[in-house]
Amino acid sequence: MNIILKISGKFFDEDNVNNLIVLRESIRELTYNGFRVGIVTGGGSTARRYIKLAREIGIGEAYLDLLGIWASRLNAYLVMFSLQDLAYMHVPQSLEEFIQDWSHGKVVVTGGFQPGQSTAAVAALVAEASSSKTLVVATNVDGVYEKDPRVYTDVKLIPHLTTQDLRKILEGSQSVQAGTYELLDPLAIKIVERSKIRVVVMNYRKLNRIINILKGEEVSSIIEPT
C-alpha cells in the first residue's frame, strides 16, 4: 500500500532530535509492514523568517515563495539523511522528478515544487502520482477542529468529515501569501477529491503510533473526499 506523509514545518521548529528519531523508526515500521512511503516537508519558521525579511525590503511574492520552497527542501534533506538506507538519496524539485525517484522503490522525500503552490498541494499531487489512497497530514494538533484549538479551549475534535465540510471550516481563513498556507489549501482539496484520496490528520508527536492511527484506533481526523 502506498501512502504519502505530509510533515508540518512546525515539526522542525521544535529543534528536537527525538522527533527525527521517532520519524525514522515510524517509517521503518511502515516499510516493514508493507507500506511504500513518500514524505513532503513544510518550510516552518525557517521559511517564515526569510519571507518576513524579504517582504520587508519589498521583494515580490513569487520570490518569497521561492525562499519558502528552498526552506522546505532544506527540511527534506534533513529527513532524507536521517532515514539513511530507507531513502532514495535525492530530493526531487518537480513532480516529474518525484515520479522518476519513486520508481526506485525507496522512500522519497521532497519539499515544495513551484511558487504559488503549498506543500499541502505538493503532497496531494505526489499522492495522486504514486497511486496512494491515503495522505497523512502530521501537524501539531490531533486533527481537525471547528476553530483553532491553540486559541480556543472549548473546541472539540471532528473525527470524521468530508472535504466539503473542511472547505466550510477553512472558508475565509486561507491566505495565498507566501508562508501562510495551513492544513489543506483549495488546490490540495481539489486534488484529493478528483483522485478519491482519504486524508488523515494527526499529531506528529504520535508518529510512533501511526499504524494504529491508520487503523482508526487512535485519535485523529479522517477526511473523506466528496
UniProtKB/Swiss-Prot annotation:
GO terms for biological process: 'de novo' CTP biosynthetic process; UDP biosynthetic process. GO terms for cellular component: cytoplasm. ATP binds at residues 6-10, 44, 48, 139-140, 145, 148. Transmembrane segments: none annotated. Keywords: ATP-binding, Cytoplasm, Kinase, Nucleotide-binding, Pyrimidine biosynthesis, Transferase. One of its GO terms (molecular function) is ATP binding. It is found in: Cytoplasm. It catalyses: UMP + ATP = UDP + ADP. Catalyzes the reversible phosphorylation of UMP to UDP. PANTHER family: URIDYLATE KINASE, URIDYLATE KINASE PUMPKIN, CHLOROPLASTIC. Belongs to the UMP kinase family. Homohexamer. This is Uridylate kinase. It comes from Saccharolobus islandicus (strain M.16.27) (Sulfolobus islandicus). The gene is pyrH.
